[in-house]
Amino acid sequence: MINNIFNKKLLVYNEKDQRWYNKFDRTKPLFSPSRLLSFKNYIFEKIPAKNLEYPIEFGTSLMQIIQYYFENQSKLDVILNSINEEKLKEVFLLFLDYLKTNDYSLIAVELHLFSPKLNHYWHGFADVVVKTKDDKYKVLEIKTHNEIQSVPSWKFQAGVYDYIISQELSNYEPSAILAFSRKQAKLSVYENDSLDLSFINKINELYS
């Protein structure tokens, strides 16, 4: 099991507030669940943002739960009991069901929180690397807003996009796999390549 998948080369750790910061913009922290004492308090910590036009703390909480679950898969009952937002729990259970239905093994999670250069709002996503039953790799990219339109919305939107990773990359570290796949992912998103519409629709139904 690989724990705490963060690209340390791009992050700076601040001892005073015990948080990771983006090396290129130290005003915007990245959070690591493994460094916090209370998971229940942490997942509902709001992230400061200007012109916040949609409930980003909900989407961010989903990412943090997935990260925490990856590091503590034996504590599923504890995690579920810590989530006091029913829709958040429902989406997380959909994610787990998605893994089980497709027979995916969770092997890496990379969490990002950042502010696009031309906008003032935060958005977050988690890249989840899974191994398929035929020993191939996929990246599940979990969206917390409609990236294609890049417009913040009150309606929470989420989707999972599958990206096949070349078997030649199987010997790379998960962080390298993620970096490689993300370069190709943009085109796939705009072309709607390998979009799992059934899973996206299930999630969006919760917010219709």
UniProtKB/Swiss-Prot annotation:
It comes from the Bacteria. InterPro entries: PDDEXK-like_dom_sf (IPR011604). Gene3D superfamilies: 3.90.320.10. This is Uncharacterized protein UU146.
